[in-house]
Curated annotation (Swiss-Prot):
Composed of two chains; the small (or glutamine) chain promotes the hydrolysis of glutamine to ammonia, which is used by the large (or ammonia) chain to synthesize carbamoyl phosphate. Tetramer of heterodimers (alpha,beta)4. Residues 1-403 are annotated as: Carboxyphosphate synthetic domain. Mn(2+) 2 binds at residues 299, 301. It comes from Halomonas eurihalina. The lineage of its organism: Bacteria, Pseudomonadati, Pseudomonadota, Gammaproteobacteria, Oceanospirillales. Its EC number is 6.3.4.16, 6.3.5.5. PROSITE patterns: ATP_GRASP (PS50975), CPSASE_1 (PS00866), CPSASE_2 (PS00867), MGS (PS51855). Gene3D superfamilies: 3.40.50.20, ATP-grasp fold, B domain (3.30.470.20), Carbamoyl-phosphate synthetase, large subunit oligomerisation domain (1.10.1030.10), Methylglyoxal synthase-like domain (3.40.50.1380). It catalyses: hydrogencarbonate + L-glutamine + 2 ATP + H2O = carbamoyl phosphate + L-glutamate + 2 ADP + phosphate + 2 H(+). The large subunit is composed of 2 ATP-grasp domains that are involved in binding the 2 ATP molecules needed for carbamoyl phosphate synthesis. The N-terminal ATP-grasp domain (referred to as the carboxyphosphate synthetic component) catalyzes the ATP-dependent phosphorylation of hydrogencarbonate to carboxyphosphate and the subsequent nucleophilic attack by ammonia to form a carbamate intermediate. This is Carbamoyl phosphate synthase large chain. Large subunit of the glutamine-dependent carbamoyl phosphate synthetase (CPSase). CPSase catalyzes the formation of carbamoyl phosphate from the ammonia moiety of glutamine, carbonate, and phosphate donated by ATP, constituting the first step of 2 biosynthetic pathways, one leading to arginine and/or urea and the other to pyrimidine nucleotides.
Length: 1076
């Protein structure tokens, strides 16, 4: 039966900011759903608080709301837009929870809105652990032995029945938030307490331990006529006990017998039928006991998920697009498969003739205090996917695509003495981010497959595959390049070995190895992802490399532009860069170029098969990019949009004759190299903070004294402020030097005088090489010293004098012309005591480009891509800066809740995973909405409220204004001695509270007794930061709002004065008033 005609308009709820457990895969699914439904003639209304998404581009929906995803804000949107239906299955857990809230508060009933894609009963049955357990019993399937607890007493009762270890999982959370494995009473108490706080219905499921069992996922799609297909069966390389988002996963499943697969297939279909998912995609997770073969259903997600994005990219079957069409009444047999050009219907189960491996990307280096062991709570921030003809090939491609400095199964332990072996065994028994490397090391040390299976519970089949790779490496290390025959070289490349790894094993330079390989005629061929194992022809150029005979690339002779993507998400390089790559591809396609995308991140829109004309799902490494460039012969390659990943390759690509368009690699180097940059700043007569470069510890101490403390120290060439710190004296610098010089890669350490209490500004600009147009000026809310990616910022600036802004515009334009920028450029400036200082210049895409584009209503990335391809700003009609008539605030979102031991203080090292945007007529309104969108607690506006203040000496004067504002808002004040004395001298009423080391009762006791509603706590110096970290960690755990900068505290006071009225505005209407 074709689509429904009784609904005309549909509200899609997005997933909000990127957080651990919920990343850009929901931008990919949401963007697909928007396209699919508009294709069918429906009016699409979208709400999503994340400006860095493609789905919030104003062209993707008829009405776009970048607003907080709370049921109260969405109610306002429903009231204004009157949709007929709401589709909550495209925005992850955020959208499901919001839809359930709308249902619970009677909003859907009040406005006559139908929930499509999944109904409230099905969502509740899948999400409510008790109901799900009962449902499985009804269809004769087993769940892990488990019971639901609503209180600590019930939890202890259940634990006594199940024993230890037990697995704890809260209801209605994603990414395993608040869950964990408890081996003893102390851990049990801690995990349950945290779990109860995070579950929105105060409910925990306590399971028997399935640690060491095999884990599988089935991606299933079902329509209303009960047609069901399995899109993909995914097997976890890591056994149960590691969250599936943190596991290495492989598709199709490798170690199931056909009978086991059919049983699991039947079971997953039965689960969907029982839960009542009638229209769309779901994923069902199974555990299998390797000893007895017992199968249990672990859980199911009645929505598009992280693994469905992976399954879509792995098979070419667009689950989100199909699910959206099923939600409006189509059946699978009525929909055709795009990849085969409609030659097959969507009811054909995909079959694949290759192996896909996904490996998660972790950023534990950002959180040294965090527990880096992998458990049932997800900790990875991104992932990489690779496709090969064999498991070995796809695994090795994925390992080099991770960009963690590994070219393959690189050794982590070099000496197999007692200490080395103890370290290896520890890493094998309790999984960390690099366990697979330690498995290889254990094999090098002589452990057998059987011993490794006992230590890790990783299936023997995978271990045998790894053993073969390790053995091959050991044999190779005894030989020289000159004695290898072409046949042997070909066999090595078929196993997925990278040129760099083979060169390392053979003791030659990578480029010499590559020359020898190519001279022997050993080159990759490109195969197509076609959903049907080459049974039908495919018109879609979605490709991966392999070492085989026949190439399916079918290269055209059209002029081509190649865009290099950013690889896996990580803190410091996320969805914002993918957004820029997508926009570059769209602009170039519109201008008549054939567009080629190279990337290996399965979550993103850039790796959707219809974003570009040709997609190469390949690691973004020199070897892989050179081979594609040689095959395609593009007219130009864009390396400036994907963050550091492609930029790192720029020089070598250029040297190999690859045509890089836009700002030259030399100009990029001029901006990034300290000494060359200094020359440029001096030449233009601009100012920089006093700075120096040190190549040894002694030199660092001498130069730090000369430029004066406090100083910011960092290694050269970093993104996201890796290993960047503020040091306040020589002992802190010494401490830093012992840790940081390791990451310096023989490159020096940079020292800058730190501009205390300066206002920091970010400016994005576009240049065509002659003319420069400012994209937007953003004023940071936190003072200098907080990484620009972590600071909230406002556009237009809310307190920066107009003449200062004009001078900044002038400086940016002069620098762009001097550097010969062609494309995007981002400049960070600071204003202190009437002087403007240049902090840094990046002649490339920055993470603020999507936010600025949403504010001004013009895609800066598209304008810049056209400049790079030789179309001037005048020809594009983009000749003057657009200053919006409304305020927008970008707020960062942090993963601290996933890492309970980490101090949530902001520093020059970037820690945020995502961002939200709030807009309003005033700065206060925009800031308030950004806080709501970020899920930040905002102090209550009524009742008895106490604010606790404890600030560093330089802030003692400034805190008086904050205290006055808080008193005016009805707060009572308490403060530590020094701060209290400053407030008392200003005549303000305040109670004195002990610092933690001054005796009880102290500040943390107050917090734990729920006696504090708001905290302002600023510190400087390593000792003071350590002393006060318990205050911030306790505030975070107890959801008490806090500010760690005075500027942040002032902004919160303004937001509180604004009140809590919720207004919603359509992005298209906002933009109508800002056109040039």
């Amino acid at each position: 039966m074709p689509k429904r005609t009784d609904i005309q308009s549909i509200l899609i709820i997005g997933a909000g900011p990127i957080v651990i457990g919920q990343a850009c895969e929901f931008d990919y699914s949401g963007a697909q759903a928007c396209k699919a439904l508009r294709e069918e003639g429906f009016r699409v209304i979208l709400v999503n608080s994340n400006p860095a998404t493609i789905m919030t581009d104003p062209v993707m929906a008829d009405a776009t709301y970048i607003e907080p995803i709370t049921w109260q804000a969405v109610e306002k949107i429903i009231e204004a837009e009157r949709p007929d239906a709401v589709l909550p299955t495209m925005g992850g857990q955020t959208a499901l929870n919001c839809a359930l809230d709308l249902d619970k508060h009677g909003v859907l009933e009040k406005f006559g809105v139908e929930m499509i894609g999944a109904n409230a009963d099905a969502i509740n049955m899948a999400e409510d652990r008790d109901l799900f357990d009962q449902a499985m019993k009804r269809i004769g399937l087993e769940c892990p032995k488990a019971k639901v607890a609503h209180s600590m007493d019930e939890a202890w009762q259940i634990q006594s029945e199940l024993g230890f270890p037990v697995i704890i999982r809260p209801s209605y959370t994603m990414g395993g938030s608040g869950g964990g494995v408890a081996y003893n009473k102390e851990e049990f108490e801690e995990i349950c307490t945290r779990g109860f706080e995070l579950s929105n219905n105060h409910e925990l499921l306590i399971d028997e331990s399935l640690l060491g069992w095999k884990e599988y996922e089935m991606e299933v799609v079902r329509d209303k006529n009960d047609n069901c297909i399995i899109v993909c069966a995914i097997e976890n390389f890591d056994p149960m006990g590691v969250h599936t988002g943190d596991s290495i996963t492989v598709a199709p499943a490798q170690t199931l017998t056909d009978k086991e697969y059919q049983n699991m297939r039947d079971a997953s279909l039965a689960v969907l039928r029982e839960i009542g998912v009638e229209t769309g995609g779901s994923n069902v997770q199974f555990g299998v006991d390797p000893d007895t073969g017992r199968v249990v259903v672990i859980e199911m997600n009645p929505r598009v998920s992280r693994s469905s994005a992976l399954a879509s990219k792995a098979t070419g079957f667009p689950i989100a697009k199909i699910a959206a069409k099923l939600a409006v009444g189509y059946t699978l047999d009525e929909l055709s498969n795009d990849i085969t050009g409609g030659r097959t219907p969507a009811s054909f189960e995909p079959s694949i003739d290759y192996v896909v491996t996904k490996i998660p990307r972790f950023t534990f280096e950002k959180f040294p205090q965090a527990n880096d062991r992998l458990t049932t709570q997800m900790k990875s921030v991104g992932e990489v996917m690779a496709i090969g003809r064999t498991f070995q090939e796809s695994l090795q491609k994925a390992l080099r695509g991770l960009e963690t400095g590994n070219d393959g199964l690189d050794p982590k332990v070099t000496r197999f003495n007692d200490d080395g072996m103890a370290h290896i065994k520890g890493e094998l028994q309790v999984a960390g981010a690099e366990r697979i490397f330690y498995v290889a090391d254990a094999m090098r040390a002589g452990l057998s497959v059987e011993e490794l299976f006992r230590l890790t519970n990783i299936d023997r089949w995978f271990l045998v595959q790894l053993e073969d790779l390790v053995r091959t490496e050991a044999e190779l290390a005894k030989r020289s390049l000159s004695e290898l025959t072409p046949r042997e070289l070909f066999a090595l490349k078929r196993k997925g070995f990278s040129d760099a790894r083979l060169a390392g094993l053979l003791g030659v330079a990578e480029k010499d190895f590559r020359r020898t390989r190519q001279a022997a005629g050993i080159r990759p061929v490109y195969k197509r992802v076609d959903t049907c194992a080459a049974e039908f022809a495919t018109d879609t150029a979605y490709m991966y490399s392999s070492y085989e005979e026949e190439c399916e690339a079918e290269v055209s002779d059209r002029p081509k532009i190649m865009v290099l993507g950013g690889g896996p998400n990580r803190i410091g390089q996320g969805i914002e860069f993918d957004y820029c790559c997508v926009h570059a591809a769209l602009a170039m396609r519109d201008d008549g170029y054939e567009t080629i995308m190279v990337n290996c991140n399965p979550e993103t829109v850039s790796t959707d098969y219809d974003t570009s004309d040709r997609l190469y799902f390949e690691p973004v490494t020199l070897e892989d990019v050179l081979e594609i460039a040689d095959k395609e012969k593009p007219a130009g390659v864009i390396v400036q949009f994907g963050g550091q990943t492609p930029l790192k390759l720029a020089r070598e690509l250029e040297a190999a004759g690859v045509p890089i368009i836009g700002t030259t690699p030399d100009a990029i180097d001029r901006a990034e190299d300290r000494e060359r940059f200094q020359h440029m700043v001096d030449k233009l007569g601009l100012k920089q903070p006093a700075n120096a470069t040190a190549r040894s510890x002694e030199e660092a101490f001498a130069k730090a004294e000369a430029i004066g403390y406090p100083x910011v120290v960092r290694p050269s060439y970093v993104l996201g402020g890796x290993a960047m710190e503020i040091v306040y004296d020589a002992s802190e610098l010494e401490n830093y030097m012992t840790h940081a010089v390791k990451v310096s890669n023989d490159s020096p350490v940079l020292l800058d005088h730190f501009l205390n209490c300066a206002i920091e500004v970010d400016i994005d600009a576009v240049s065509d090489g002659h003319q420069v147009v400012i994209g937007g000026i953003m004023q940071h809310i936190e003072q200098a010293g907080v990484h620009s990616g972590d600071s909230a910022c406002a556009l237009p600036p809310y307190s920066l004098p107009a003449e200062v802004q004009d001078e900044m515009r002038d400086q940016v334009k002069r620098m762009a012309v001097e550097l010969g920028v062609k494309g995007l450029m981002n400049v960070q400036l600071a204003w202190q005591d009437g002087e403007i200082y240049v902090i840094e210049v990046n002649p490339r895409a920055s993470r603020t480009v999507p936010f600025v584009s949403k504010c001004v209503g013009t895609s800066l990335a598209q304008v810049a891509a056209r400049c790079m391809a030789g179309i001037s700003l005048a020809e594009q009609g983009f000749v003057e800066e657009i200053v919006p008539h409304f305020y927008s605030v970008k707020e960062a979102v942090f993963p601290f809740a996933k890492f309970p031991g980490v101090d949530p203080i902001l520093s020059p090292e970037m820690k945020s995973t995502g961002e939200v945007m709030g807009s309003g007529d005033t700065f206060a309104e925009a800031f308030y909405k950004a806080q709501l969108g970020a899920g930040e607690a905002i102090p209550a506006l009524e009742g008895e409220r106490k604010a606790f203040l404890s600030v560093r000496d330089p802030d003692k004067q400034g805190v008086i204004d904050v205290a006055r504002s808080l008193l005016g808002l009805g707060f009572t004040l308490c403060a530590t001695r020094g701060t209290a004395s400053a407030l008392q001298q200003a005549g303000l009423p305040v109670d004195v509270v002990n610092k933690v080391y001054e005796g009880r009762p102290h500040x943390v006791d107050l917090l734990k007794n729920d006696x504090v509603a708001y905290i302002v706590n600023t510190t400087e110096g390593r000792q003071a930061i350590n002393d006060s970290s318990v205050i911030r960690r306790t505030a975070l755990a107890r959801k008490v709002p806090y500010a760690t900068t005075l500027a942040g505290a002032n902004a919160v006071c303004l937001a509180l004065e604004y009140g809590n009225a919720i207004t919603v505005r359509r992005l298209q209407e906002l933009h109508a008033g800002v056109s040039q």
